[in-house]
Each structure stands twice: as structure tokens, then as C-alpha cells.
Amino acid sequence: MSAQAQPEAVTSFRAMRMQDLDAVMAIELRAYPFPWTVGIFRDCLGAGYQAWLALVGERIVGYGVLSIAAREAHVLNVCVDPAEQGQGIGRQILRMLLRCARHHGAERIFLEVRPSNPHAIALYS
């Protein structure tokens, strides 16, 4: 009988902070051919957007960014470290963002997906 590694589930979420941006950018650069800039993340945090880190223990494995205004939420970014993809972490992040949107009174939630991002299309389908 062989032992197989079990996928790691997110153990907690916490709000993203400015001091997390180096780690966030490292994941962003590994994950996307056209990544957000650190300035975009700074602007999101400065504007008070909901920005959350997904953690396994103390290790950042992904994040999500959500804007909420006028009872509408817009999922701006969901990212999982490529080394951690395929374990359901993106789905956990998306569910957390949906709960956050509802908690803040959003009645509608929008997101856009690039046709070149099959992982996201599969997640949102």
C-alpha cells in the first residue's frame, strides 16, 4: 500500500496588508503572464477594497481582491500559487469572497475572465 499526499486545505484567511506585498507579488509574477503591478495592489489596499490572503499554516498560498460599492461586488483578482494549484484553494478563496460580498450587502457579484485563463474558466463554471 502506498501513501499519497493529501491536498493541503486553506487553514485560515486574513486581511492583506502592505507588508505582505512582496510575497503577494512573488505569487502574482509566477502565476500570470500579465501580472498586476505592486502599485495596483497598493491602490486596492489604499482604497479599502477587500483583499484577503489564503494561508496554509503561516504560508501564503493565494489571495483574492474584491471591490464592493452600491450593493455590487466585483471580483478583481483570485490567484493561487502555481505550485499549489489543483487542490481546491481557488474555490476556497472564491467562496470566502462571496461570503464577504454578502456580508457587506452586495446583491450582485461580477467577475471577468480572460479567455486565455482556462483554470479560472473551470473554477467559475
Question: Residue ranges of each PLM-predicted region?
Answer:
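Aromatic-flanked redox-active Cys/Sec active sites in thiol-based oxidoreductases
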Residues: 80, 113-114
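Acetyl-CoA-dependent GNAT
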Residues: 3-7, 12-87, 91-104
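Conserved active-site alpha-helix within GNAT-family acetyltransferase domains
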Residues: 87, 91, 107, 116-125
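Short beta->alpha junction loops/turns
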Residues: 30, 114-116
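Conserved hydrophobic beta-strand within the GNAT/NAT acetyltransferase core sheet
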Residues: 75, 109-113
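The identity of the second residue at the extreme N-terminus of proteins
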Residues: 2-3, 124
